[in-house]
Design a protein with these regions (language model features):
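Charged, solvent-exposed interaction patches on well-folded alpha/beta domains
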Residues: 10-171
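Amphipathic, non-transmembrane alpha-helical segments in extracytoplasmic/periplasmic proteins
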Residues: 1-6
Length: 171
């Protein structure tokens, strides 16, 4: 099902007597894109490849830097080289939190070049540094709290990698 219908995230079939079948579909959300040798690939919150697109179709999606897809195929989870495999896992955690917290539309670039301290551009004003792939849900909670306490004119870096606290550096 998933290779033929890549935008299906989950499918649940339930049967009710006497002769009724209900199919419930949960749709994948196009969230970001990665660049491969053959073009651009759209990924969902689980790093599943949804489709190959041209540069003109990338509007509204976050660019992912630092991961190069290996043999990308529609409907399959993003595969990267052995060294980049942890980056894909971390990317899925980041995208999942962005979707859950309705923050995806404010992210333009996710940089996984440094797997131990990836970051992303948020709201065009902040560079967010995440640190190691641990407590991701907690870090995004701290990020939302920090952003809510800053003014609309504040710009700079929010570092979530130190001491389980959000550190803001203006600039």
């Amino acid at each position: 099902i998933f290779s033929k219908l890549p935008y299906v995230d989950k499918a649940k079939v339930t049967r009710a007597l006497p002769n009724r079948v209900t199919i419930t579909i949960q749709e994948s959300s196009a969230m970001a894109y990665v660049q491969a040798d053959d073009g651009y690939w759209v990924v969902d919150q689980n790093c599943k490849l949804l489709k190959s697109v041209t540069e003109s179709e990338l509007t509204g999606l976050a660019r992912v830097d630092g991961i190069t897809p290996v043999e990308p195929k529609v409907g399959e989870v993003l595969k990267a080289g052995e060294a980049d495999a942890p980056k894909v896992t971390y990317l899925a955690a980041i995208l999942g939190q962005l979707l859950t917290r309705d923050m995806a539309s404010k992210v333009t670039v996710i940089d996984l070049s440094d797997a131990s301290n990836p970051g992303f551009t948020y709201d065009g004003r902040f560079t967010v540094r995440l640190g190691a792939n641990e407590n991701v849900e907690y870090k995004f909670g701290m990020l939302q709290s920090a952003v809510s306490q800053l003014t609309d004119s504040d710009t700079g870096t929010i570092d979530l990698s130190i001491d389980k606290r959000a550190h803001f550096s203006p600039g």
